[in-house]
Regions:
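A phosphate-binding catalytic loop at a beta-strand-loop-alpha-helix junction
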Residues: 88-98
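Cys-dependent protein tyrosine phosphatase-like superfamily
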Residues: 1-88, 102-140
Length: 140
């Protein structure tokens, strides 16, 4: 798990047994950016969701396949960020979740700052700079 910015964290696939630890760490929301059955050994969304709800953690499912970013997922991520809840977003490696954060955060931060933050977190998205700038200019 990597802290990306303030109360937003990204991680690779989590397991049902991880949810109790997330509760202890005061996470309020888990955001799954993975479609079911992406890999054979992947726990189902329902399994993770039921553990989250049993532990009083909000659960949202915004599945994104690699390379398939859409406006709806970005806008829903923006809504999550506006709540300021301590949130863990996950996918297979954390990359898609962090990319969604990057697009959503261009509303509040300059693109260079977003790229600096993601790079510091271990995700180099320099190849997305032009796309992030275009999104920022059209969504303001």
């Amino acid at each position: 798990m990597k802290r990306i910015y303030k109360n937003f964290y990204a991680a690779h696939q989590i397991q049902a047994k991880d949810i109790a630890q997330l509760k202890q760490e005061k996470f309020e929301c888990v955001l799954c950016n993975r479609p079911d059955n992406e890999e054979q050994d992947q726990p189902s969304v329902e399994m993770i969701k039921s553990q989250c709800l049993a532990n009083g953690i909000e659960f949202l499912h915004l599945p994104i396949t690699p390379g398939d970013f859409n406006l709806e997922a970005i806008m829903e991520t923006e809504k999550v960020l506006k709540t300021a809840k301590k949130t863990l977003a996950y996918c297979r490696t954390g990359t898609r979740s962090t990319m969604l954060w990057a697009f959503a955060k261009t509303k509040d931060l300059e693109v260079d700052e977003v790229l600096k933050i993601t790079d510091h977190s271990g995700y180099n998205f320099q190849h997305l700079k032009e796309l992030l700038e275009t999104y920022k200019s059209t969504s303001s």
